[in-house]
Swiss-Prot record:
UniProt-listed PANTHER family: 50S RIBOSOMAL PROTEIN L15, LARGE RIBOSOMAL SUBUNIT PROTEIN UL15M
Annotated NCBIfam families: rplO_bact
Keyword field contains rRNA-binding: yes
Originating organism: Cupriavidus taiwanensis (strain DSM 17343 / BCRC 17206 / CCUG 44338 / CIP 107171 / LMG 19424 / R1)
Family affiliation: Belongs to the universal ribosomal protein uL15 family.
Name of this chain's protein: Large ribosomal subunit protein uL15
Free-text function comment from the UniProt entry: Binds to the 23S rRNA.
Keywords recorded for this protein, A-Z: Ribonucleoprotein, Ribosomal protein, RNA-binding, rRNA-binding
Chain residue ranges for the region called Disordered: 1-48
Length: 144
């Protein structure tokens, strides 16, 4: 047996379905589309969400919320993430280099999730009240 002699097991591969190629193929004439109607015509299919003229669901429900334009430029960083960092001073550049925030991010906020056991100085980042308390309890500080 050699690599150029290998063949797939019998019945494991199927030929591509060729529709509309004669009666003997089993998929000739109407080519599996049935008789008449919109779905049998070429290009004849409704758009996504169309409900046959009934008011579609996306129009029956009220509008809600909005897409924030600043979402891509803001980020959250947890105390758990900061604990894993080697740096004693943490700022936006350090977070970007560590891959904790994206390159487009312009401002980040530290949130209280996880524990902080070492002294850390936070520069130029926001912090929640709980995160501030945890950072200061560990001997760290938040610089403006």
């Amino acid at each position: 047996m050699q690599l150029n002699n290998l063949k797939p097991a019998a019945g494991s591969k199927h030929a591509k379905r060729r529709v509309g190629r004669g009666i003997g193929s089993g998929l000739g004439k109407t080519a599996g589309r049935g008789h008449k109607g919109q779905k049998s015509r070429s290009g004849g299919f409704h758009k996504v969400g169309f409900e046959g003229g009934q008011m579609p669901l996306y129009r029956r429900l009220p509008k809600r919320g909005f897409t924030s334009l600043t979402k891509a430029f803001t980020a959250e960083v947890t105390l758990r993430d900061i604990e894993r960092l080697e740096a004693a001073e943490v700022d936006l550049l350090v977070l970007k280099q560590a891959g904790l925030v994206g390159d487009l991010v312009k401002s980040a906020k530290v949130i209280k999730a996880g524990e902080l056991t070492r002294k850390v100085t936070i520069k130029g980042l926001g912090a929640t009240a709980g995160a501030k308390a945890a950072i200061e309890a560990a001997g760290g500080q938040i610089a403006a």
